[in-house]
Amino acid sequence: MLTLALPKGRLAEETALLLLSKGWLKNLPSEGSKELTYVSEDKRIRLLFVRSQDVCTYVEEAAADVGIVGWDIIREGGFDLIAPVDLKLGACRLSLASFPDFDLFAKRSKVRVATKYPNLTREYFFSKGISCEIIKLYGSIELAPIVGLSDCIVDLVSTGGTLKANGLKEFESILFSTARLVSNRSSFYHKHAELRSLIESLEN
């Protein structure tokens, strides 16, 4: 039996529907259920529902054989995982945003940046040769420049609607992200036949 870690929320629902269409599930988990695990009727697969930020940890530490998680989280965490399949789900981009009159190169002191992605943000500003001060937040990132906490933000953008609603402009995309199937190295070799079957199902 393969154990698959899924992020709670919309991506878990999309993945469950995908697994249903590929024959890995015969029924969907009960809507609104508080259970954190779900085993398929044929015992081929067990689902774990965890926070998106924890999927890679569950997989890397072999608590799950595989997981589905955004490319942004994989890159930010620097996890030692195999990522064999791009599922093309949950497409979004990690972008630099601020007020329309913001000039990244005008400030002579450090640029103050609010983000949930300190490592990718630091890497981006380093590539530009610009010194930055990272302010790590866990939500409502768009609020930071509005209240003067930061000069700009680096955050995930899907449609840009939240930015526009708060008077902010997207300046540059740093990273394009979609959901990926990831595997820990041990499971990839020791459960290769099962994993290959899952991978082929998801790729077709």
Curated annotation (Swiss-Prot):
Q: Report the pathway entry.
A: Amino-acid biosynthesis; L-histidine biosynthesis; L-histidine from 5-phospho-alpha-D-ribose 1-diphosphate: step 1/9
Q: Does the keyword ATP-binding apply?
A: yes
* Broadest EC class assigned to this enzyme: transferase
Gene Ontology CC terms: cytoplasm
Kindly state which keywords UniProt assigns to this record, in alphabetical order. Answer: Amino-acid biosynthesis, ATP-binding, Cytoplasm, Glycosyltransferase, Histidine biosynthesis, Nucleotide-binding, Transferase
What GO terms are given for molecular function?
ATP binding; ATP phosphoribosyltransferase activity
The Gene Ontology biological process terms listed for this entry are:
L-histidine biosynthetic process
Its principal location?
Answer: cytoplasm
Does Secreted appear among the keywords? no
Q: Which reaction does it catalyse?
A: 1-(5-phospho-beta-D-ribosyl)-ATP + diphosphate = 5-phospho-alpha-D-ribose 1-diphosphate + ATP
**UniProt-annotated location(s):** Cytoplasm
What EC number(s) does this enzyme carry?
A: 2.4.2.17
One Pfam match, given by its short name, reads: HisG
Oligomeric state and partners? Heteromultimer composed of HisG and HisZ subunits.
Q: Which family does it belong to?
A: Belongs to the ATP phosphoribosyltransferase family. Short subfamily.
Q: Which NCBIfam families match?
A: hisG
The record comments on the domains as follows: Lacks the C-terminal regulatory region which is replaced by HisZ.
Query: What name has this protein been given in UniProt?
Result: ATP phosphoribosyltransferase
